[in-house]
Amino acid sequence: MSLSHWLSLISLTFSTFIFNTSEFVPIGLLTDIQTEFHLTKASVGMLISVYAWVVMLLSLPLMIMVSKMEMRRLMLWLLGLFTAFQVMSFLSDSFGMLMLSRIGVACTHSIFWSIISPIAVRIVPEKHRSLALSMVVTGSSVAMILGMPLGRIIGLHVGWRMTFLSIGIFSAFTFCYTALKLPIVPSRGGFSVRKLPALLNQKGIIGTYIFTLLVSTAYYIGYSYIEPFLKQVAHMSDSLVTAALMIFGGAGFLGSLAFSRYYSRNRKAFITWVVALMAVCLLLLTPTSFSTSLLIVVCAVWGMAATAYNVAMQSNIILITTPESTSVAMSIFSGIFNLGIGSGAFFGGQICDHADISYIGYAGAILGFIALLYWIKRLGTRV
């Protein structure tokens, strides 16, 4: 690839980093936000659930509304609005205002994750598309390694509001860099609701969406409450919790590497193995909580498998849909994935409040194995 291709991909990596950091940084700040606003775990967990449900509801309609817009211009609009809503989060003096700002961020998220992968594969030569997708995933991995833990460190030392302001500042920088380095990416034409039946009739797409819902719900039953789990069940210190979250995210690099090396050889087997690993890691959360080292190993494998799964499913959708429907197909994927995030956070919160936080791994594992059986029995021969 040429230098211009690399610089363009870096702009997408930066964007992925800030969007992913913003999406998940509340997970590392839940305890502080809960304490300040005097909320229960289930109530503060709604900060994650509502965000995810907004993305679920708005991904498709918003993407259809902007489907005719040139993608570079659209990306800059998204970054500008994203920055403004981060500042609003910083200024929030009530849980309601914070929730409203997060809903605004969720609206930009709804479109961002629908276009980021299609843009990545369009700005590079065809033979480098897997690398382009891996670069996008790298932004997500760095967010898990540095973004969320660093946001948590900032929150612990100078308050959770400064975490959101820091994201806003980096977002403003990313806006400027993207304006300079991302080339014009023409729209491939508008997409109307009338075309949805044809999209949904494409081979394997409905089953892929059902599978995505099951896996994402299972994953976020556990992951949404990983910070209080590590503190209350594993009795880790604040510094160890931060380290565990960094290792979780860092393992995503291995997941990205595994995807680039093995996914194209056998898509069915690759997805089967990574989902199996995710379910096993959820199952082992509580049994290994007596040992910090064992639990961190489980978190590392879990993070690796989760990243590999995410990029594999995005690649799968690009492969099984037509070029003109890819962005809308990705918007539906994003919406369904976020339905899983919201549902997982909701069910996990109910388990924390009405049973015990130590059970979240078991609940996630049960649903994860159900998803795995669905994949093997219903989708394995069709995807």
PLM features: residue spans?
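Intracellular juxtamembrane helix-capping segments at the cytosolic ends
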Residues: 111-124, 308-322
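A late C-terminal transmembrane helix in Major Facilitator Superfamily
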Residues: 319-357, 364
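Helix-loop-helix hairpin linking two adjacent transmembrane segments in secondary transporters
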Residues: 97, 125-182, 225-229
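Helix-breaking motifs and short loop linkers at transmembrane-helix boundaries and internal kinks
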Residues: 38, 70, 91-97, 108, ...
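Paired small-residue
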Residues: 81-88, 96-104, 293-301
